[in-house]
Regions:
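Loop/turn elements at helix/coil->beta-strand transitions in domains of secreted/extracellular proteins
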Residues: 42-43, 61-64, 104-106, 129-132, ...
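Sec/Tat-exported extracytoplasmic proteins
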Residues: 49, 60, 104, 112, ...
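Bacterial Sec-exported substrate-binding components of ABC uptake systems
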Residues: 1-54, 158-189
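Acidic/histidine-rich, surface-exposed loop or edge segments in extracytoplasmic proteins
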Residues: 26-32, 103-108, 128-130, 148
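Short beta-strand->loop
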Residues: 67-68, 90-92, 109-113, 135-138, ...
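Charged, glycine-enriched surface loops/patches
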Residues: 117-157
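A short, structured surface patch at a secondary-structure boundary
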Residues: 47-103, 107-116
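A structural signal for short loop-to-beta-strand junctions that line the ligand-binding cleft
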Residues: 34-35, 85-94, 133-142, 149
């Protein structure tokens, strides 16, 4: 009888140890405490939006669950063939939650401006999908830090460091530039299918 009572306790302890070994608590870039699988146990990642998808494609393309819209010909020309036909899960109010859940991502990543709305969106998305959602700072000036954070999260530190170093060098080069006011140009950066969204 004693052995019978000890066995479940030991089994429970083993389960707890195994669970701890397979997960970790991190602080994401919004300051949220999130329990996520260890890097080797993250098999696929849902991107909450296009910026997150691009980050994932650059850092860990094989873990990218899919895109957030149909890629156009220009985008396909610079994206490797094997990733062009990943499913389109939508974004924002148009996310196909059933399709995402069926695809069974390990975690989700949301890249954008860190504010109360983003934090709320991450929490809501986590409840809807039933997986941890990690917030990443999408500010351009935080690019290097974001790459390194993603690399550590996904176990792709070497690739992330290459991207982070490139970002830091680029910003350093820009800081050194001295362009006279009359030589500076104004640029329109458009988004959307017709480049008419800002």
């Amino acid at each position: 009888t004693k052995a019978a009572t000890e066995e479940p306790t030991q089994s429970a302890e083993q389960d707890a140890t195994q669970e701890t070994a397979e997960t970790r608590e991190i602080t994401d870039m919004a300051g949220r405490k999130v329990t996520v699988p260890t890097a080797e146990n993250i098999e696929s990642v849902f991107s909450a939006g296009p910026v997150a998808a691009i980050f994932l494609y650059m850092v860990a393309p094989d873990k990218l669950l899919g895109w957030n819209y149909e890629l156009n010909d220009v985008e396909k020309s610079i994206i490797l063939d094997k990733y062009q036909d990943l499913p389109n899960f939508g974004m924002g109010d148009s996310i196909n939650y059933e399709a995402v859940i069926a695809a069974d991502p390990t975690i989700a990543v949301n890249v954008g401006t860190i504010n109360d709305k983003m934090i709320s969106d991450c929490d809501k998305l986590s409840k809807s999908l039933g997986v941890p959602v990690v917030a990443v700072d999408g500010d351009l000036s935080a690019s290097a830090e974001a790459y390194r954070f993603m690399g550590e999260l996904l176990g792709e530190e070497e690739q992330a460091e290459k991207l982070a170093s490139y970002a830091e060098k680029t910003f350093a080069d820009i800081e050194k530039m001295e362009v006279p006011e009359d030589k500076k140009v104004r640029i329109y950066y458009g988004n959307g299918e017709d480049s008419l969204e800002t």
